[in-house]
Design a protein with these regions (language model features):
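N-terminal subdomain of nucleotide-sugar transferases
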Residues: 1-3, 26-33
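Nucleotide-activated donor-dependent transferases that construct or modify glycoconjugates
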Residues: 1-11, 59
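Short acidic-aromatic active-site loops that bind/stabilize oxyanions
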Residues: 11-12, 65
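Short N-terminal binding/cap micro-motifs at the start of the first secondary-structure element
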Residues: 12-18
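Glycine-rich beta-alpha loop elements in corrinoid/cobalamin-binding modules
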Residues: 18, 25, 33-112
Length: 112
């Protein structure tokens, strides 16, 4: 099973420590199954979706912040159309304040 931890950063020069920490936390046995993908908010929705689709994850996690939340919401709408069997997980400060509400709004999301 392939896991994709995804960050959408504010700038190309930024990186997201959360996805690196999560991958490190799974342990050496599982690390080969965890891939990281970093994009920026300046990339098009189509480009990001293509980058995700090429990796063919079975499970994808998004690190959600104020600067990327609008774009991630768009991705959540489109992603099930191209990867219908992929589980979607959300984390970060933009999704932890109202998990039940977000799960109602985005039924395609597996969990927070």
């Amino acid at each position: 099973m392939k896991f994709l931890l995804t960050a959408i950063n504010a700038k190309f020069i930024h990186s997201n420590p959360a996805i690196y920490s999560l991958r490190a936390g799974v342990g050496e046995k599982l690390q080969p199954y965890v891939e990281l993908a970093e994009f920026t908010i300046n990339e098009s929705l189509e480009s990001i979706l293509e980058g995700i689709w090429k990796r063919q994850p079975k499970v994808i996690g998004f690190s959600c912040y104020i600067w990327n939340w609008k774009l991630i919401r768009e991705i959540l709408t489109e992603l099930p159309k191209i990867l219908p069997d992929t589980e979607i997980w959300l984390g970060g400060p933009e999704v932890t304040y109202d998990g039940p509400g977000l799960l109602r709004e985005f039924p395609q999301v597996t969990g927070i």
